[in-house]
Amino acid sequence: SISLRIASEPLLSQSYKMAGDVEKAKQILQAGIYQITIELLNLLLPYMELCEKDDGLFEEICRRTLAITKIFHLETLHPSVLLTVYFSIAHNFYRRGNKEKTLDMLEKYTELALSGIYPLRLHGDSFFTLLDDWLEENLPLGNQLPKEEAVIRKNITEALTDTGLFA
């Protein structure tokens, strides 16, 4: 059984606000929103796979997942997560026999992988204006990803060429 999750960020943020540190209060909320957005996507992808036999639900999960990535500008905010989303959706469309949508997602994956997303680093944007400092202060690797960039690029390529998932 899973316990009900209650985010601690609103309470912590309120404490900082009451102490007069509004910037810290904002930073805590931004970090929480960022983390929950990534966590939500990490929940939606396996749920999508489990619901692949229900056409309507499967399509709705895909639609909502892609909407979240667009709303939060993951193409620039966290492209490595967006690559995972595109790949997962493509694979699920492939398993369902939908060649057109498979190719559409693989095209998006390839375009993003070949775009100017490198070097891949965790960072904020115009919405997450206080995230950069939070990442540096709270993550052991700061804004660095846990893998070397050469390994990441190789994995991105191998996802299409060596996995056999689309064979």
Whereabouts are the PLM-identified features?
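Generic helix N-cap/helix-start motif at coil->alpha-helix transitions
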Residues: I2-L11, Q35-P46, H78-Y86
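Short coil loop/turn residues that delineate tetratricopeptide repeat
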Residues: I2-L4, A31, I38-E39, I71-L74, ...
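Residue-level signature for tetratricopeptide repeat
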Residues: Q14-S15, M48-L50, N92
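Structural signature of tandem alpha-helical TPR/SEL1-like repeats
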Residues: V22-K24
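Conserved structural position within tetratricopeptide repeats
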Residues: I33-Y34, E111
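Alpha-helical protein-protein interaction modules
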Residues: L43-L45, D54-F166
